[in-house]
Amino acid sequence: QSQLLSCILMFIGGSPGGTAGGIKTTTIAILYLTCWSVLKGTEDTECFRRRMPAANVRTAFSVLTVAGTAVLTGTMLILVLEHTGLIPAFYEVVSAVGTVGLTAGLTPVLTTAGKLVIIVLMYMGRLSPVTLALLFASRYKKYGKGRKLPEERIMVG
């Protein structure tokens, strides 16, 4: 139970502008406020009588998606490579992505392949998920300038 709570806190991390890792408290706040605005039936994400830009909302969801995918992929890789339990593997991976430095005792006994997975996740966590996503997406940006595709409304939920 305490490891799960620690994983949640490590994944969220600290506030922006500091040295803490994780997806940042403001990202979680924007995600929560966006869900709240959907439940209220309002179109805009609002906080303290201010409207959040749509770009911030998209970035927050992108950060969550990239970081969540990294955690899930890293956990699966550690499970396959190390033949360990789910909780210790998940704890190590979240600690690496959040650049926390805590361990459930698994790090010293990892194979070279497992250590490489953790190293890649640490670098990814240090650079932040959105920086990495923007780095890889920047080369596709020039092709979409000046054009808008038709809108398609789909049922969600």
State each model region's role:
Residues 1-157:
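Membrane-proximal intracellular helices of multi-pass ion channels
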